[in-house]
Structure formats: structure tokens, C-alpha cells
Amino acid sequence: MARLNPSKPSSRGGKPRSSSADAMAEHKPPPGRPKREGEGASKKKAKSGGFESMGLCEEVYRGVRHKGYRVPTPIQRKAMPLILAGHDIAAMARTGSGKTAAFLVPMIQRLRRHDAGAGIRALILSPTRDLATQTLKFAQQLGKFTDLKISLIVGGDSMESQFEELAENPDIIIATPGRLVHHLAEVEDLNLRTVEYVVFDEADSLFSLGLIQQLHDILHKLSDTRQTLLFSATLPQALADFAKAGLRDPQIVRLDLDKKISPDLKLAFFTLRQEEKLAALLYLVRERISSEEQTIIFVSTKHHVEFLNILFREEGLEPSLSYGAMDQEARNIHISKFRARKTMILIVTDVAARGLDIPLLDNVVNWDFPAKPKLFVHRVGRVARQGRSGTAYTFVTSEDMAYLLDLHLFLSKPLRPAPTEEELLKDMEGMNLKIDRALANGETVYGRFPQTIIDLVSDGIREVINGCTDLIALEKPCTNAFHLYLKTRPMPSTESIRRVKDLPREGLHPIFRDVLGSDELSALAFSERLKSFRPKQTILEAEGEAARGSNQWLDVMKKKREVHEGIINLVHQKNNVDHEPKEELVENISNWERKDVCGNKRKLQSFRDEEYYISSVPQNQHLEAGLSVRANEGFVENRLDAAVLDLVDDETSGMQAQKTRYHWKKNKFVKLNSGDRVTATGKIKTESGAKLKPTKTGIYKKWQQKTHRSIDTGRKYGGFAEEGASTTGSHQRGNRKHTAAGRGRRYIPNADVPSEIRNPEQIQKSRQQKAMDIARMKNRSTKESKFQKFQKNNRRHDGPSKDGKFQKNRRPDGNGKNRRPDGNGKGRGKGKGNANGFGKGKGKMKGKGTR
């Protein structure tokens, strides 16, 4: 019995009901029941500019209210209307501003209901597993009142379980590029041509050189009519790096350019040596950070994660940890414990720097200074979210000072050193008031970590390390890994390297003002003066003068030093004079004498009209350089690439030759696109750092044979339907689908699927065909049995007899013996017939017999 379709026209000739009418009838409350909160929210137009004014359907609006949103954030208010209108956008806003909801809410509003025959309709790509898992949970919460199916495709999980999810025809896929490329190579039936909505979350990280090959394979399988969205907290203004994303007339939304980090975030930079970081970290965790506050610690390598994990456990602290090569189940367990506040410390690498949203996070500690300014923004963006305050502690060594200057050029924030101990002893109240005003104005103050504290904590750490064999075994791998990290990180800018040499000496950081008293400050000032002490005599002179008193050789050394000091002072005076203004040299000279000095010709002077002056360097040069996708390679490679001028050849052969590059390992020329790099083995690098070949391994076929299921996402069927219609509001006439609204035509999957209901003629024809096939098979089996019987009898014939008839004899030689009854052995005997059973002869004969 066929199921009634409410969207079909009635037999009375009435007009078909549209999908919007069905939705209104479905959600209309029964009489006598008051409306629930949020019911009919898509109709009313609130003046407050909330989600009610965006035209969301009831299911989506209820999900938004259930999540706790009341008023959209600036990025949501700016981007969501453009997305709902169908525009491609590239959006940038600082971390914690609600970018995830800005693309999830329009996606759920567009899809609304599950459609098993439409295939995959939305694809969200994330650079890391943690970010993809977080996006999945967020999408499930927003789509709680819809029946949309969402699938998570990330590395670390079993392929078979992901095959099960794909076989259920999900509407939305949230994936990492490496695992999705693996599925595309493994499953031939997996089709992405039906995708209408594509989101690149953290787009600048996705389009970096590490993942560009995977994205190229994915984008090649997408439809050209898709809607493409780029979201990131650090997105450059020039979209040339995202040319392969296929943006069509994109709308650029960039908010909070002057506030790249939260204004509620406090920054603290401590200068110290590399070997002092352990003591400084333990002191911060124990003394400065409350036990009720959650802290995330960023380190450079996974070896440092393991080392700090064991050290903290030896000290009585239980941390959670996460890094790229860690098992996915273990990562989920550690992150879940940290979210549930069972542990208060999380030690991670930069795999958790992007997009990881942990509620109620209070502090961030940067063990190693990030080499890229935007990486620092992503790290510290984990705290001070949604109106909460937080603190970011950063350790800075002497090699990291140039990166510190680059960071503040990117943030457009002034940087000043903390006052020295001598300045504090002279005017402590005035210096403290000056520092407080600088911090209130948004300036960054960096200073030293107290040496007395480091000395006290370092002794205890050394005892713990010497008593633990695991820590001793991890010391050398940590050192080697850190050296490799220093070699591979990008170089800072040349200007910052030059400016570091002119920076003044910093004092104690203001955060430790309440720790040290005036006596300790005096001791620190004395120790700092000892560091700058330079004796006037060499050790030989001092010992000689103490032993023998004044003599001729000591007098010669003193006279030599006096002469040299005079020359040195003259050089210093000359350098100081060169830096003074030239006008001071002729200040007291008459006009006539001035002409002799300066000349009669007027000198060329510099003049700049600020209103009409056009600089050769853009004002936001440091900002865009830090936001650039190619910034991962450092400033040197960017400048070299910008200085190269490639002229396109005027012949086809020359154009093709320009796109090829000789590969040393493959021993041939390979074809490259713009921005692509040569890979030695053709392997792809996943988000965990593992390398694998995107080739078919046969695991999908094994899963098919085991479960007798397959993945079919609309690869075989597809058609066109009218523009503006959805699959839920369409009706079917014959083998075509028609919609209720719109005159244009657009591609809708499975629109031309033939009906499976057969008429009596088709049933009769199929039965006749089946009967004919059965009769043909019976006839064939009868003929085969006769032929087999004939062959069996023919094996027993040994040859013709005298009268020409075949005589049956199981001995192929006629009369002799045969050791192999099947006729393949050697036969001996007398009589007529040879070893094959057909010839004539007398005497003994040898030969191979055949059947």
C-alpha cells in the first residue's frame, strides 16, 4: 500500500500545500494551549536586533535559546544575514567572539530537516581533531530540535565506525582534511558533489603549506555552486592565499582589528634563562595561581609535555595532557577530566591553540615564546572569554626578545621595561605610580623573575629529577627536541633584531612588588651593580702591586691605559657630536659667516603634508605580515617570493614547463600549481603529524563483506528541480519532481529517481522473463550432464578394435599393465595399440597414456 503524500495535489483539484505551509501547520499550537517561549519567533520583528529579527525557523530559534544565547555578538550580527542571503564570506574576529555559532546557525536554518536521499549537504573542515570534536558538540546542541544527522570524520577513530556513520546518509560532515582524503580514496561511492555549504574553520591554518595538498584534493570533488565560508581569528585582508577555496564575490567581515586580544586579558612577560623555566613555572603554579583556577600550559614538543607531566606528579600535582601524536581515546579522557574540573592544569602543545573552548579557564602559561604573533593570539585567546578576566604568563629568554618586539608591532601596543632596583630605591612611590598608569593605558611591562625565588625552587627540582629515573631518561630527548625546535621555527624580522640591541636593562617585574621588601631590593641592586662592575686594573697588576708595591712596569701600564682612555673618550665625543642637530654648530655665527659655511644655494629640505602624504609602506604593514598565511615560513622567504617576477611564456610548451619542477627522488619533472611544494613520497601529513599515502587499502571492501552494507551518497542519481524549492516541499509526477515555488531550475540530488511501484504489465513481464531464465538454466544443466557422461565413457575407450568398433578397456595400452589408471602414466604391454590407445604395433612399448 502506497503511503499518502501530503504535498501532492488533492483529488478535488486544490492547490498543493507548500513546505512553509506544512511547517506552519505542523508547529501551530492546538487551541486552548498558550504559546511556548520562542514559538512563532520567526514572525515577530524585535527592535532589539536579537535573533528574533533574523527570520529563523522555530526549531533553530529554540536551539539558540536552549544554548543560552539572547543577543547576537557583533560577528554574528554582521555575518549571519550575509550567510542567510547566500553570499560567500571571509570573516575575522578575535577568539571567543562567537564565530562558531555565526556559521552553524545559518547552516541548520538552511538544511532544517534530514533528507536521506539528498546526500551530504554541508561540510565543515577543521585543522585539528579537538576543534572538530568541539564543533560537533556545539552543532548537536544548536540542532537539538531538528532531525539532522551529523557525522564526525577525524583521525584516531576506527575507519569501520566512520563507515557506519556514512552509511546512514548524514546531512552534515565535520572532518579534518587528512582523514577525509583517506575516506575519499577508500570509498568510491563517497560523493561531495551534493555539498551546498562549505565552512573552512580556522582558514589560515587550513590553507597553510602543511594541509594545502589535502584541501586541493577535497576542493576538486566539490560542486562549483556551493556556498563557501572562511572563518578565523587571524585572517589577512588580501585573499590571494585562499584563491583555491573557490570564493565567488566574497563579502569580507573583519571586526576588532584594534582589539586582537580581549581587553580583560592581563599580560605578564618574565625575562629569564632557559634552565630557569622549571623553577619559575613551579613557583607560578604553587604561589601565584590559585588552586581554584584552571591553567593551560603551552610547550613546544611532546617530550616537554611528558617531562612536565611526570615532574608535576612527583610534586603532588595531577595535570592533564594532550599532544598531536597521543592516542585519541587518551586525549578525550584527559580533556574530559579537565573540563569536569577534576584536574586544574592542562599541558598541551600548539595542537590545542586553535578553537579549543574550555569554560571557566583563567590562566595561560607560554613555556616557549610563540614564533608567530598570530599563534600568540590563538594561545592567549583561550582565556578572558565571554566577559571573564584572565592572565597570560609568558617566559622570555634573550633569544626571544626580537619575537617580543614583533608581537607588539602586530598588536600595536607600546612596550616598556620595568624600572630597575636603583630607580625603585630612589623613588619607589613615583615609579610604582608610573607603572600603574602605563598598565592602565594598555602598555606592556616586562621584567625579570626574582633570582632568590629561582634559586630556592631549583634546588628542590634537582633533587626530584635525580631521584626519578623517568625524568633522567627524558632530559636528553627534551634537549634534542628543543634544539630542533629552535632550528625549524621562523626567524624574526631584521628590524626587531636590530632594535633588541638598543633596549635598556629591565628591572624586577611589578607583579613581585609585594614579595620583596626594601632590604631585598637593596641586595638585588647591589648584585646588579656587581654584574656591571669593571675593574680598572688587570689581575696581574693588582697582584703585582700588592706584592712588590709600585715599580717601573706597573707605571708603564698605567700610562698606557691613560693614553688609551683619552683616545676612547675622543671617539665617544665624536659619536655624540654626529648625532646632534647640525644647526647647533653654527648657532653663534653671523649671517655673513653662515653663508660661507652653508653656501648660497638653498638645501633640499624634507616636508610632509599629513593630509595628502601617501606613504610607500602601508600603515598596517606589521599587522598584515603577521596575519599572512605565508608568515609560517618567516620574513626572509616572504621577501624573496615577493621579489621574484615570473613572466608567463607566450607558447604552450613554455607555459607547461614553467609549472614543472625537477624532483630529485622521483628522478623526473613533476607538475606543480601556484604555492604547491614537492613531496618526496606523495604522502599526506595528517593533523596528528603522521604521514600516510591516500591510496586504497581495501578496508572498505572488507567492511562491506562483513556488514553487507555500503555507502551511497547520491553518486548514481541526480537531476534538476526548480529554484527555491526544497526536497521536503516537492511533489512527484511520474518520474520527475516538481516544486511549489520558483521558476528557476537548480540541481537537486535524486530528483529523477524512477518510481519503484510497478504496474501489472511490468509484473507479468518480469515473471515471464524469470520463467524463461529458469527453463534456460534447466536445459543447460541437461546438456552439461549428457556431455559429462559422454566424456566419462570416452576415457574408458582404449582404441579401435579389428572390426572398427571401440572396445572398453581400462588399460590404455590394450593388453599391458598401467601403473596410473587415469592414463597419464607409462604403459607397458604386448598387443595391438600404443600407449595412447590408438596406434597398432607389436612388442613392448613405452609411452604416456592420455584420457
Curated annotation (Swiss-Prot):
Instruction: Give residue numbers for sequence motif Q motif.
Output: 49-77
Q: Which residues form the Helicase C-terminal domain?
A: 277-426
This protein's name: DEAD-box ATP-dependent RNA helicase 29
Taxonomically, the superkingdom here is Eukaryota
Give the compositionally biased regions (Basic and acidic residues).
24-42, 773-787, 796-825
| Cellular-component GO terms for this entry | cytosol; nucleus
The uppermost taxa in this organism's lineage are: Eukaryota, Viridiplantae, Streptophyta, Embryophyta, Tracheophyta
Bias type Basic residues, positions: 733-746, 841-851
Q: Name one Pfam family in it.
A: DBP10CT
Residues reported in the UniProt entry to bind ATP? A93, R94, T95, G96, S97, G98, K99, T100
Family per record:
Belongs to the DEAD box helicase family. DDX54/DBP10 subfamily.
- Which keywords belong to this entry? ATP-binding, Helicase, Hydrolase, Nucleotide-binding, RNA-binding
Q: Where is the composition biased (Low complexity)?
A: 7-20
Q: Where is this motif: DEAD box?
A: 201-204
Comment block on domains: The Q motif is unique to and characteristic of the DEAD box family of RNA helicases and controls ATP binding and hydrolysis.
Q: What Enzyme Commission number(s) apply to this enzyme?
A: 3.6.4.13
Q: Which organism is it from?
A: Oryza sativa subsp. indica (Rice)
